[in-house]
Amino acid sequence: MLILVVGLNHRTAPVEVREKLSFSAKSLQGALAQLKSYPVIEGCAILSTCNRTEIYAATLEMDDGLNAIWDFLSRWSGVGISEIKNFTYSHTLYDTIRHLFRVAAGLDSMILGETQILGQVREAYQRAIEYESTNRVLNTLFQQAITVGKRVRTETGIDRNAVSISYAAVELARQHLGSLDGRSVLVIGAGKMSELTARHLVANGVSSVIVSNRSFERAVALAEQFRGRAVRFDELYRCMEAADIVISCTAASHCVVKAEEVSRVMDKRRGRAIFMVDIAVPRDIEAEVGNLAGVTLFDIDDLKNVIDQNLAERKQAAVKAEEIIEEELDGFMKWLGMQFVVPTISALKKWGDEIKQKELCRALNRLGNISEHDRKVICSMANSIVNQILHVPVAQLKSYALTTEGHLYTEILQNLFNLDVPGQKPKKQPAPAGIKEPVLAKKG
């Protein structure tokens, strides 16, 4: 059994191509059924996110399996096969397994070590199970990938440090304020970055969200997402008097938070400290605000320094993660290799047993009336001869099963002995140039 993947991601294809080759949750059942209908596909699963689409398949024929996946993608999306090949990558067997393990660990993501992808891998597997498109090999592969993803995060901490602007702001707030439970935040601006930062703050315990924006309607829309309160822009200093945290990210071309006004706010706060983060470019908060007593101010450059440091730590963790993946990959390959050779070994032993039984029957019939003792001696000798003849090829095949050449030697053995292995088709090797194919005489 061979495992393949054909995919595209943010590195290989622009968004206008990725969106054509994406699969919604509603379309997944039909897509898996269509892909599974190809005779060469024994099992399949589809991983589709905003940054990647990957088709995983189990097949008996590598080239035919790849062609089936490309044909499926073309028919499903309406994009030509040649164009799809320009934007996709493909891996087989060993490289497929390593690739999925790296994906689940967050090592192949746009943001190194991000956590969302592990849940997406789990979801892809669960949908394949639900829609009955997978098989035993893919089941074990995805289960192991999920285990690898968990192990990497537990043992390396690759996902512990913030590498986005919005989350870095939250991390700094937590470092300076301790627990964020019950804290209040004033968000100045109602754009995407303000929304992301507010969302992270609420997820980390902030209980009160106030949004101030020049467009009051947009402030209301953002505040409603967090059961917060919207205030008009001329009320922001009054609201600042009670806030623990201020996040500012407007599109203004000049500073909207003045040091003189914040100084008055701090007088009214009577020594109670305030934490402020200016995410805007150009800056929203005058730099002099950071010099005021009781004010801790960070700007976008401070956040980027935090992110750079955290990225360096994640890259260091990624080195350990790769070691874990190689260790897990070795274990999975041993399991997979044995799954492939065990049916062949059984077929070989069956082949030997059939010959033994046929020849024993012939010999015993010729010998006629012999004692039970002699019969047992002859049967024991026949068993011993067959077992000794098969011992070396069986032992060698088991040892090759643990290498990348396992499939090759298994196929050679199947061809040499013309073994009928359920679910595996021995490939008929063409005769070398200049040599005629042998003509086998018909029996009888």
Swiss-Prot record:
Annotated stretches, region: Disordered: 425-444
An individual GO BP term: protoporphyrinogen IX biosynthetic process from glutamate
Tagged with keyword DNA repair: no
InterPro entries to which the protein is assigned, alphabetical: 4pyrrol_synth_GluRdtase, 4pyrrol_synth_GluRdtase_dimer, 4pyrrol_synth_GluRdtase_N, GluRdtase_CS, GluRdtase_dimer_dom_sf, GluRdtase_N_sf, NAD(P)-bd_dom_sf, Shikm_DH/Glu-tRNA_Rdtase
Top-level EC class: oxidoreductase
Biological pathway: Porphyrin-containing compound metabolism; protoporphyrin-IX biosynthesis; 5-aminolevulinate from L-glutamyl-tRNA(Glu): step 1/2
HAMAP family: Glu_tRNA_reductase (MF_00087)
NCBIfam families attached to this UniProt entry: hemA (TIGR01035), PRK00045.1-3 (NF000744)
Subunit structure, interactors included: Homodimer.
Stated name of the protein: Glutamyl-tRNA reductase
